Structures are given as structure tokens and as C-alpha cells.
UniProtKB/Swiss-Prot annotation:
It comes from the Bacteria. It catalyses: 7,8-dihydroneopterin = 6-hydroxymethyl-7,8-dihydropterin + glycolaldehyde. Keywords: Folate biosynthesis, Lyase. The gene is folB. The active site is at residue 101. GO terms for biological process: folic acid biosynthetic process; tetrahydrofolate biosynthetic process. It holds the Pfam family FolB. Substrate binds at residues 21, 54, 73-74. SMART domains: FolB. The keyword Protein biosynthesis does not apply. Transmembrane segments: none annotated. Belongs to the DHNA family. Coiled coil: none annotated. This is Probable dihydroneopterin aldolase.
Length: 122
């Protein structure tokens, strides 16, 4: 199995149930794990053009999150998963995604709240 993991990429997004909560962008952590259909060509060639560019991957995540304001983490995760699948289906057979709200507006909650979603890519 060949897998690429990008862990805890911070994205600033408009998210929240209330208008007040969405008014200021909030930090969201996105982690994604991509399982490849076969050995990526880059493993043999050592050429960046034969692999998935990390910068392009996180840029896709950032742009998608910025262009799709959501009330809830669950919806944001689904939107991101759909975009990743659309962009990477020819290369990957499975996508695991975790979206974490670093600072949920809940008193005494000291750690992020996360939602995870996983999909086998046909």
C-alpha cells in the first residue's frame, strides 16, 4: 500500500451556526490521507511532476474551504472530500479526511472538535 498523509494543515474559514460566529474567520485543521491505486511513478523517477504536489494539494483544500462557507464541520468535510475525489480519482483508491475546529465556542472545551470521513474511490 502506498499512502500520502498531510496532517494538520491550518485553513482560516468562515464557519459556524450563528452569523456572529461566522463573522470572523476561524482556524480549521485539515488532515488527509490518500491511498494510491498502485505504486506512484514518483517512487521510481524522483521527479516532482510524477507525484502529487503537496503545495497544490493544500492549495486545493484552502481554496475549496474559502469558497464554501459552511455552518458545520460535517458539511465542510463532505465538500472537501468531494473536491479531493474529483481531483484525484485517477490516482487514489481511498481518501480519509479529518476536519478539526481548533477553537469551538464552547466554554471549558480545551481541545479541537473533529469530524472524520472516509471514502473508497471507485
Amino acid at each position: 500500500m502506498y499512502r500520502l498523509d498531510v496532517t494538520n494543515f491550518r485553513v482560516w474559514v468562515s464557519i459556524g451556526v450563528s452569523e456572529q460566529e461566522r463573522y470572523h474567520k476561524q482556524p480549521i485543521l485539515v488532515s488527509v490521507s490518500l491511498v494510491f491505486r498502485e505504486e506512484p511513478k514518483v517512487c521510481s523517477t524522483d521527479e516532482i511532476s510524477d507525484g502529487i504536489c503537496y503545495a497544490a494539494l493544500v492549495s486545493l483544500i484552502e481554496q475549496t474551504a474559502a469558497n464554501h462557507p459552511c455552518a458545520l464541520l460535517e458539511r465542510l468535510a463532505k465538500v472537501l472530500l468531494e473536491k479531493l475525489e474529483e481531483s484525484l480519482a485517477q490516482f487514489v483508491c481511498k481518501i480519509d479526511l479529518r476536519v478539526s475546529k481548533e477553537r469551538p465556542p464552547i466554554p471549558n472545551l480545551l481541545s479541537p472538535v473533529s469530524f472524520s470521513i472516509s471514502k473508497e474511490v471507485p
